[in-house]
């Protein structure tokens, strides 16, 4: 519908403007931008909305650093001031578990309310600098949550793994994680 198209366009514009702001304000700082891949935000938005309409209660996201800040800001609604303070060297989010870590390793969670009024818990897991190390961790987190909820069909808690580069087939951990999907 036209309203859906406008909504997706606004999500795309938010993602693009955020990247341009970070690029202008923090020249030369590592930020692992989403530039060229901004469509990830409307894609994730559509996935969450569609999943919720089919009974999904929780989405657990795992991704390397490329685009994490944008996902944190626009999918998990991590406040801009928290993200920007991490650029200024204040990476403490008040929980005391992030001292010395870098902004593009941080995780976050958020209770999202869909356009239809359904609540979906979103979480982005912490990820170290080892690109796809988080992938099997996400599979384990989701498997445990599904077992706890007795979600035998695997429809209430859904893993989303975002691979942001071309070395997909060259990383053994990716193939091993795909094998886990059949457990």
Please provide the spans of the model-predicted regions.
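Conserved internal helical-beta-strand scaffold that buttresses enzyme catalytic cores
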Residues: 1-183
């Amino acid at each position: 519908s036209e309203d859906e198209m406008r909504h997706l366009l606004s999500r795309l514009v938010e993602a693009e403007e955020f990247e341009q702001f970070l690029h202008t304000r923090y020249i030369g700082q590592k930020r692992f931008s989403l530039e060229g891949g901004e469509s990830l935000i409307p894609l994730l938005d559509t996935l969450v909305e569609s999943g919720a309409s089919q009974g999904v209660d929780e989405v657990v996201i795992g991704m390397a650093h490329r685009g994490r800040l944008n996902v944190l800001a626009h999918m998990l609604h991590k406040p801009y001031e928290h993200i920007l303070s991490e650029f200024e060297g204040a990476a403490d989010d008040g929980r005391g578990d992030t001292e010395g870590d870098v902004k593009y390793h941080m995780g976050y969670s958020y209770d999202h309310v869909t356009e239809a009024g359904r609540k979906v818990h979103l979480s982005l897991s912490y990820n170290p600098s080892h690109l796809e190390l988080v992938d099997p961790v996400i599979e384990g987190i989701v498997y445990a949550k599904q077992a706890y909820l007795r979600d035998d069909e695997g429809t209430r808690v859904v893993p989303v793994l975002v691979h942001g580069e071309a070395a997909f087939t060259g990383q053994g951990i990716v193939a091993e994680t795909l094998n886990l999907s059949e457990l």
